[in-house]
């Protein structure tokens, strides 16, 4: 991989940003996309130290993404559904939410957005949230992945990023039940390891690396 068009950091939690500096050092990044969010008195923004300086020094453009913006990406486009919110009740609900489309392929990523943010997305976009592949909200937490939201997304497949025997019980059985309710195939990093999804001839295929399951995040 010679370079990245975009490095998207959904929200300032270490499990979503921890290796951002390593990526910026290892690869040329054209654009760093960040959400709009300011910490309240009860929360802190856990961005990697000197992230902005490192991005600027590497030549990356730093953008605060806003809902409604679209960015070209290969033969497709990256649409910003939620660009974060200064009024969000939590940093999770301020997560950058994106929909990548290319032909008939649609990939939805909502970061750690929880039920309130999911409902706002349903109210705003309705059935146009439909995705071929959905990255499970908040690692498959019960606070996300509501049935109402999953019925709007109607994914062909769900990718759950979670560690083996993690302390949070991800993915939660309620989330798994909601995925099953809408007929989605579920792939989990704690069981299958690294997941590589390939869209070819209108068919979604996945390659796994089971030996990496113990290290999945």
Residue spans for each PLM region:
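Non-globular, low-confidence helical/coil segments that flank catalytic cores
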Residues: 1-217
């Amino acid at each position: 991989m010679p370079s990245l068009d975009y490095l998207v950091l959904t929200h300032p939690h270490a499990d979503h940003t921890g290796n951002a500096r390593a990526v910026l050092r290892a690869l040329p990044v054209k654009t760093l996309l960040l959400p709009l969010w300011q910490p309240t008195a009860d929360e802190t923004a856990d961005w990697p130290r000197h992230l902005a300086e490192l991005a600027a020094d590497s030549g990356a453009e730093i953008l605060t993404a806003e809902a409604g913006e679209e960015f070209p990406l290969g033969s497709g486009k990256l649409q910003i559904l939620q660009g974060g919110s200064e009024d969000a009740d939590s940093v999770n609900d301020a997560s950058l939410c994106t929909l990548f489309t290319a032909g008939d392929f649609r990939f939805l990523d909502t970061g750690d957005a929880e039920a309130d943010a999911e409902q706002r997305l349903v109210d705003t976009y309705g059935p146009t949230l439909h995705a071929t592949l959905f990255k499970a909200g908040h690692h498959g937490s019960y606070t996300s992945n509501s049935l109402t939201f999953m019925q709007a997304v109607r994914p062909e497949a769900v990718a759950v990023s979670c560690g083996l025997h993690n302390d949070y019980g991800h993915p939660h059985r309620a989330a798994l039940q909601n995925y099953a309710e809408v007929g989605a195939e579920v792939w989990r990093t704690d069981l299958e390891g690294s997941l590589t999804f390939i869209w070819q001839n209108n068919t979604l295929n996945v390659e796994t690396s089971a030996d990496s399951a113990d290290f999945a995040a």
